UniProtKB/Swiss-Prot annotation:
Mg(2+) binds at residue 69. InterPro entries: Beta-tubulin_BS, Beta_tubulin, Tub_FtsZ_C, Tubulin, Tubulin/FtsZ-like_C, Tubulin/FtsZ_2-layer-sand-dom, Tubulin/FtsZ_GTPase_sf, Tubulin_C. Tubulin is the major constituent of microtubules, a cylinder consisting of laterally associated linear protofilaments composed of alpha- and beta-tubulin heterodimers. Microtubules grow by the addition of GTP-tubulin dimers to the microtubule end, where a stabilizing cap forms. Below the cap, tubulin dimers are in GDP-bound state, owing to GTPase activity of alpha-tubulin. GO terms for biological process: microtubule cytoskeleton organization; mitotic cell cycle; response to antibiotic. Dimer of alpha and beta chains. A typical microtubule is a hollow water-filled tube with an outer diameter of 25 nm and an inner diameter of 15 nM. Alpha-beta heterodimers associate head-to-tail to form protofilaments running lengthwise along the microtubule wall with the beta-tubulin subunit facing the microtubule plus end conferring a structural polarity. Microtubules usually have 13 protofilaments but different protofilament numbers can be found in some organisms and specialized cells. This is Tubulin beta chain. Its cofactor is Mg(2+). Keywords: Antibiotic resistance, Cytoplasm, Cytoskeleton, GTP-binding, Magnesium, Metal-binding, Microtubule, Nucleotide-binding. The gene is tub-2. It comes from Neurospora crassa (strain ATCC 24698 / 74-OR23-1A / CBS 708.71 / DSM 1257 / FGSC 987).
Amino acid sequence: MREIVHLQTGQCGNQIGAAFWQTISGEHGLDASGVYNGTSELQLERMNVYFNEASGNKYVPRAVLVDLEPGTMDAVRAGPFGQLFRPDNFVFGQSGAGNNWAKGHYTEGAELVDQVLDVVRREAEGCDCLQGFQITHSLGGGTGAGMGTLLISKIREEFPDRMMATFSVVPSPKVSDTVVEPYNATLSVHQLVENSDETFCIDNEALYDICMRTLKLSNPSYGDLNHLVSAVMSGVTVSLRFPGQLNSDLRKLAVNMVPFPRLHFFMVGFAPLTSRGAHHFRAVSVPELTQQMFDPKNMMAASDFRNGRYLTCSAIFRGKVSMKEVEDQMRNVQNKNSSYFVEWIPNNVQTALCSIPPRGLKMSSTFVGNSTAIQELFKRIGEQFTAMFRRKAFLHWYTGEGMDEMEFTEAESNMNDLVSEYQQYQDAGVDEEEEEYEEEAPLEGEE
């Protein structure tokens, strides 16, 4: 029933993916080997969205793990939940892509892609009613970015009417892993604009900030960052995995969130976020969750939505929450901060409810927003891209793999178009009262 096939590519994608499976296995009452020992019927009811049932009460993730070098996969296999995955679903090369998008997309990755598609096909054929695909990857590297986007376009060709959701880790403004990130990211965005239905943008720097500022961790590890990402992924997919009063699936989310097909890049947030010692001192209530989830400091992508306006957004509440209270809070947010929502889409906040909270919490909320402020992120990458491309720096690594400079120029202009489309809709319909938007006031209820 409404299955999702999950792919994780590259080092970043595999690490986030592993954290995600760890989180949802826990929520569904599965232990590290996939055996069910939960307590609630509700955990089993929609288990098959993400898991295949094997013999002996064992559940196996419908996940395909892809990388161009064996290292990360070995780490996943040796990790706490390594025995969960089906061994045939590990597909890896030996050479690595070396942070080179062209290697992932055209040479090394292209050699491996048919093997991956065979596994994807096998998983898809086992589904009653395939809903779509989700892929975790980063946009700054070689495998996740290059091969990830190659897989997306191949899957798109073969399953044109299924949803394609991506959880994409975008390069951060200050924390850079490799010098060619702007190239890889721009080439990837060029692909995602055309081939993905919904892209959840996550960036490491915003995650670092959340870890340090809100969770009070002095030096956060990648494990801590991945934990945050998996909380969001779990929240976005919760209404697919558990029955709730107001359910949404990938397609409903897309219908509500994407006003124009190209503008499908979302900012995500999660609440409650409290430091490890402090959660005993806070009562979690719907108003509190709402305030925290609309707080720009809690966004997991480094762009401040106060510099733009929301086209649409979606709030997913979990736990024992009252429907009326949620509706009131949502109306409240829209009325008090109406300048942050475009006025030509009335009621542009969608809510979903699910009665099962995440482990260890009474209630939580996940936020997905389609804000025009995401253009900051693309602008920033575009500027870095242009700075290097103007000098043709590092280009030989890409042309050596058979790429053409023309492709870079196309990707650059596609990204610039995307930025100006966001800008155009941000300005739309406010011609008369242009002056009011000069000074940006902070959101109500936060200093």
